[in-house]
Amino acid sequence: MTEPTRPAVRVLGRGRMGSALADALDGAGWNVDLVPGRGAHVAAAARDVSLVMLCVPDGAVAEVAAKVSASPPGASATEPGAVIAHTAGALTLGVLAPHARRAGLHPLVSVPAGPGGAASLRGAWMALAGDPLIDSVAQALQGRTFRVADERRAAYHAAAAISANHLVALMGQAERVAASADVPAEAMLNLAAGALDQVRER
């Protein structure tokens, strides 16, 4: 009995997100090719794969997407073409406009560097958009998913920023005030964790 063909994905960008996503998908049985996000090779990134994940800085997504050839050398004219996807929380699918098949996957998690990156993606909440193939990526990562339409992207990203960035800034302020009264920062963190648990249980 022949083994089923493993889905093929090319990940552009070797930063935290790209490395973590590549490791996680490789562990889930995907055929993964992790390459730098810039260089002459980008033009042929869609060749021989069903999915190209752009894991580059938000400001570079449109530029890199435009450099990926929709019909790379060697591709059959009858092939539907690879899905081009990004992992940016703030960007719509419009930045991938040169391509007919587009998608987005934004994990709602802080991805650490190193071996822990892949583990952080497994089971994480993920915002999906576009081509249904992206659902297969989320399923491979055992992600908990929801879909966000382009017209609601700004509101989604604002909510994510409030939940993460604003909370970090607020706790930093609380720690500084606590320090002025010789109160351990751990006490404030424990208090905040309890408050968040109550919010979760509402």
Predicted regions and their residues:
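Hydrophobic Val/Ile/Leu positions in short beta-strands of Rossmann-like dinucleotide-binding domains
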Residues: 9-11, 54, 128
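Structural signal for conserved beta-strand scaffold positions within catalytic alpha/beta enzyme cores
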Residues: 34, 86, 104, 127-128, ...
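Rossmann-like NAD(P)(H) cofactor-binding subdomain of soluble oxidoreductases
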Residues: 19, 23, 39-117
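NAD(P)+-binding Rossmann beta1-loop-alpha1 motif at the extreme N-terminus of oxidoreductases
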Residues: 1-48
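Internal alpha-helical scaffold of NAD(P)-dependent oxidoreductase catalytic cores
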Residues: 21, 28, 116-201
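A generic structural signal for alpha->beta connector loops
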Residues: 29-32, 81, 99-101, 142
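Phosphate-coordination loops involved in phosphoryl transfer and adenosine-cofactor binding
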Residues: 5-8, 81, 123
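Hydrophobic anchor at the start of a short beta-strand
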Residues: 9, 32-33, 102, 145, ...
